[in-house]
Amino acid sequence: MGRPVNKRVGRHLRLAACLSSGLMDVGLLASGTATTLGFGVSAIAPVSAQAQSLNLPTAQPTAQPATSPTAQPAARNPEIKVGIVQRFGDQKDDKLTLGSLAGDQLTVSFETSGQAQTVTTDRLQIDITMQPLPTPVLEEWVVLSTHRSFESAEDSAIRWQAAGINAEIAQPDAWQVWAKREDYNSPLVRRLLLENLHAEGYTRAFLDSRAVKEVPKVAFTANGFKYVRDAFTITSANRRIQLAEGNRQTFRDLYAGDMKIQPNAYGTYTLVNQVPVELYLRGVVPHEIGPGAPRSAIEAQAILARTYVLRNLRRFAIDSYEICADTQCQVYYGLADADPGSNAAIAATAGQVLTYNNELVDALYSSTTGGVTARFTDVWNGADRPYLTPVVDSLSPKWDLAARPLSDEANFRAFIALQNGFNEEEWPAFRWNRTASLKEMDEILKLYLKNRQHPLANYNQLLDISVVERAASGRVQKVTIETDQGSFDLVKDEAVKALVPPRSLLFYVEPVMEMPPATKPADNDSTGTSLGEPTITLADLAEGSNEEAGVSETPVEDSTSEASETEAEQTPDPILTGFRFIGGGFGHGVGMSQTGAYNLGEKGYSHQQILEFYYPGTVLQPISKAVTFWDGD
């Protein structure tokens, strides 16, 4: 959001306590306010002054933050809940096969008519059956904001909460902040909320509605019998479970701990792995930094991965698990590809976490910084972290950020032109140059806008992309997109989500111009430029020779001069065909650079020195009662 949420909106709209109980059914809505969606489903039409005139009591805002703090003391090796298959049931043919190791068996625990029941087997198949509904059901929620990252979504949720609108963080695809469904649980209340938000200027909020005619139901088959249950737990005596996805009959993955199939907030199911954190790290560390890294770099990665997961256990509260298994959290592949060197690094640092003022740090890291790390607020909304400040990723004094901040465009382009003297210089992602055609850019941008129900989602022509603001670390803070229907801004990490060609926020952009095909090519002309030949930029045109501009300094006869003038008049203007993005780095660039840590490790840096380099002022200590996992911002 661009401005603080108006508290008057929250006071006026927290209506659930007095309305929800009587308006749960669409059919119970007041006469004259319902419309039909098309398959027999009724929904409330947008609420007008009639609804606003209702004398509705207000509920007081709660002081509780949008996400619950995890400030309790922790065990040395706590168990965590990881969503390893997050959207099981998205496809009708989704399948999972679970198996025990030789000599062991799986125990499946579930309920039948309220009674606990168990089944023992060595192999379990889980699949989906689509269940038609007798009548379509209206499924909807109010989306208050949409984000690329959890970090910005959490900041938005906290702001809405402070304004008196209970909010929850969801991830149906992109991260979103929803008006809390149990509070805004009737069509009338949701539409009243949305109308008032729009009236107050929060026009990016929208109602995500759909009529559901069938729902996925999960079932498992064991010992020749099929059981349809919404939730069940899978355990084994040695706490090792094999997994195969799809139609594979052979097991590729092995997980420690227990498994559970459970419903999520999106009408599908999640396979959750409950696992001790030290065993979890064996499935993270070798995939995050690679087994070929120097030992000290792997140890630093192990400490960061441990710190990161324990601080972020609140991410999926809406779905009743804690962390995911992909790059939105940390990649996690279980034990199948565990590496002896990584296991040794994990064991050597067991229980150690990185802290600041006895609280776990926000242990962010990325592949490659591009030569300079970013401040937290250079990438996301929220409060700055004192230990996440711009650091030039070099062991030599390559650049003085205080004297030459990269917020200045000339300074930034000079910095990006540097190729040598950095910790990451030998890695391909350190510097890059990527071009996308107008067609490719249109597809990317229109999908981004459509998913956010943006009014410009159906623009006809993309005219320009320009960086209008940078941070001192060089990260793009605002990009303006100009179309034939109007312009809009992309702020911070939304630029990477919407544009795609940039691999980080450390970039500048140039239009790609091409000469159109000649309408009447000369018989002997073999040097004309066509759409299939090399492109030129506006900078190329500006720096071109006088001859390229159609002006000759050599005296010529009148007839030739007249011909030249005629040719110049007929020369078409170059046309925009795409955009070129020039930059450096891969990922958000906050905290440790994994490729930079490689170099530091090779130079003899210990894991303590690597962590101090990227997180100045932090303290390494064991998990204890004195350490707070997360106490909110």
Where are these regions (language model features)?
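Conserved, single-site charged/polar hotspot
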Residues: 2-633
